[in-house]
Design a protein with these regions (language model features):
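Conserved phosphate-binding/catalytic loop of the ribokinase/pfkB sugar-kinase fold
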Residues: 84, 95-133
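Short, conserved phosphate/pyrophosphate- and ester-handling motifs at nucleotide-, phospho-/glycolipid
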Residues: 46, 183, 252
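A glycine-rich helix N-cap at a beta->alpha junction
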Residues: 74-87
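Conserved phosphate-binding/catalytic region of the ribokinase-like
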Residues: 4, 27, 171, 198-310
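Glycine-rich phosphate/adenosyl-contacting loop at the front of the ribokinase-like
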Residues: 1-58, 63-77, 244-245, 309-310
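Conserved beta-alpha-beta core of the PfkB/ribokinase-like small-molecule kinase fold
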Residues: 133-203, 223-225
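Short beta-strand scaffold segments in enzyme catalytic cores
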Residues: 92-96, 105, 224-228
């Protein structure tokens, strides 16, 4: 049983200021470089949780591409189905964090993903249909996203909308995904509804479930998650806050990995959301985008120690 990721794999460069950011000036801080990409990060988290994880992406024949492949292999993520193309540059993502580890601004160059075409998806059709689940992101073109859904058959497809801009690309297809993991802003775009209040979030999430999405897990930051399922499930879920937030950039990727982990393990929606929240907790307590401590055992420990059930 394996989970397949189709989407972004890139190099992340994160800068965290040592003091309050001074705009339009050089700020002393700490810089870290690592393999990244929304879908790749989700898949590495799954690999660290003990799930067989495979990845389809496009890399350049360059140093960044080699870094992505070597770090992924070291974590147990199989990149052998990905393409390495000469003459193109591996995608990159740069983020700037303030002294409290909150992201101020980010920039990405994902143009290499233009080479991950519907034809590439067609060539991976059997791989897609053999997966327990597929994870993708809208950094891919709209036609490629649609081809993934067309090719999946009965294989559940999960999507991280990534941002409000990318969510617009996925919005017309939102009801065809098995699982969606938006924040409230991305939810507003996917559903075409206001989400400024709790009632708005609930209505928007329910509308996506009514359109066909089986699992809508809305990330609410420190407030946890609101879940709407096709089976009528509607609930809020949260864990107690972590002691120290060290890096918030990987929390969303870990959250989706925890959700997919719970799904492929056959858990109830409540338990799967607990896995998602716990994975997010583990991520924010790490200096790295993906915690090197991520494991199924630590996931269980975190649920036990941070939930009201503990």
């Amino acid at each position: 049983m394996y989970v397949l990721g189709i989407g972004a794999a890139n190099v992340d460069v994160h800068g965290m200021s040592r003091a309050a950011i001074v705009m339009r000036d050089s700020n002393p801080g700490h810089l870290r470089t690592s393999a990244g990409g929304v879908t790749r990060n989700v898949m590495e988290n799954l690999a660290r949780l003990g799930v067989e994880a495979k990845m389809v992406s496009v890399l350049g024949d360059d140093l960044f591409g080699e870094l992505v492949k070597s770090e992924s292999a070291a974590a147990g993520l199989d990149m052998s189905e990905s393409l390495t193309l000469p003459g193109v540059t591996t995608s990159a993502y740069v983020s700037i964090l303030d002294e409290r580890a909150d992201m101020l601004v980010a920039m990405s160059d994902m143009s290499v993903l233009e080479h991950l075409t519907p034809a590439v998806v067609d060539s991976k059709r059997e791989l897609i249909r053999g997966a327990a689940a597929v994870v993708c992101d809208p950094c891919l073109g709209a036609e490629t996203l649609e081809r993934i859904l067309d090719s999946a058959g009965d294989t559940p497809v999960f999507l991280d909308p990534v941002s409000t801009a990318y969510a617009r690309r996925a919005a017309p297809l939102a009801g065809r995904f098995y699982g969606l993991k938006p924040n409230s802003l991305e939810l507003a775009v996917l559903a075409g509804m206001d989400t400024d209040t709790d009632e708005g979030v609930e209505r928007a999430a329910a509308s996506l479930a009514e359109r066909g999405a089986k699992c809508v897990a809305v990330s609410l930051g420190e407030r946890g998650c609101y879940f709407a399922g096709a089976g009528g499930e509607r609930f809020y879920r949260a864990l107690r806050p972590v002691g120290e937030m060290r890096n918030a950039t990987g929390a969303g990727d870990a959250f989706l990995a925890g959700l997919v982990y719970g799904f492929v393990k056959g858990m109830s929606p409540e338990d799967a959301v607990d896995c998602a929240l716990a994975a997010g907790h583990i991520a924010v307590e790490s200096d790295d985008t993906i915690s090197r401590e991520m494991s199924a055992l630590l996931l269980k420990y975190t649920i036990r120690n941070y939930s009201d059930k503990g």
